[in-house]
Amino acid sequence: MLRVRAGSVHPVTAPPISDGAVLVADDGRIAAVGAHADVPLPPGARRVEFPDAVLVPGLVNTHTHLELTHLAGRNPEREFSRWIRTIRSLKDATTPEEFDHSAEQGVRDCWTAGVTCVADTGSTGAPLRALARLGARGIYYQEGFGPDPADRAASLAELQAAVVRLGHVASARTRLGVSPHAPYSVSEPLYRAVADFARRESLPLAVHLAESREETALVRDGAGSFAEALRARGIPVRAHHCSPVQYLLQLGVLERATGWLSIHCVQVDERDLDILRQARVGLAHCPRSNRAHRHGTAPLAAFRAAGIPVGLGTDSVVSAGDVNLWAEAAAAGLDGEDALRMLTIAGARALGLESEIGSLEAGKQADLAVFPATVLHRPPPSSTALLTVIAGRPVHGYIPAQ
């Protein structure tokens, strides 16, 4: 067993506890949360104390690209379509071993930042393998691509084969999902096919959606840089005269999939918000990445007012620079307990994991993080955790043997 005491404990779903403690059972779940004097210290339990720090639920990063960790600082391009082409070139020059090392470093960087659960999208499978090898928690969404309708069958078969291979790696802690990448990289028939596949196999699904003005121009008007690139490849493009969110509704895919995570959702209006709410979609808000690419500002307040589950994500380190979720919260205009809620239980709800993680409650998974008390002030001086624990196992920081 493990007992962690801190100057203040923040359960998130209950008021903060001054001089509090959390007791972790041998099964990796929380046995007790309360004032220090009320939480027992069983014989033989390990104990650690942080009198000047805050103990919080482990942070939840709702959107990462861990396989790109090694590319930090290597793509100065900010015009979005050119940035994407540069990323593809850099990935083409990366070996499978380099992707594996990159993803593992990304997981460790998350632990250093107090992140205990990630929702990662990628094309190589390296993030899922890294999560499984290191005993991390997360959902990995295997990306599917195929903008040409003529390639639907081949693109779907490629994605399904990847899911079969990776299915042997997935577990209850490291889950597998699929991601039909984005409206500019996935055709209408492929969207429908992947959504049907996800529903049949009970796989969570994530999509980059309404991220950029270029994407909106493609869907609404059949114009812009994405449309030009597709036509240059001989791929037919037509105007749908609607927003990207409304486009997916028209395709029927919002009804075809369960566990849907929409990433970014910057270019949205009130009708889009109503669609997302009715579809019970979770959102990943990535303000630093949106700012880096000059996409605009997602309407976070409107998301929350509409009752749409939304968490914060760092996107790739190529865009945001690091996996500092406190900096992400500051970029979203949040601080204190409001920031903490967004980084924990709100993110867990966006991923459909709120019954297991996101708050400090007896019976939940013992995913914990300890930070200097100053982390609850904006801007955070440091995102480095003093201690990070996943399912009762310390993965970052020091715990005495006895």
Say what each PLM segment does.
Residues 58-64, 118-119, 138-141, 176-180, ...:
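Hydrophobic faces of well-ordered beta-strands that scaffold small-molecule active sites
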Residues 251-256, 285, 296-373:
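His/Asp/Glu-enriched, well-ordered alpha-helical/loop segment
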Residues 349, 365-402:
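C-terminal cap of metal-dependent C-N hydrolases
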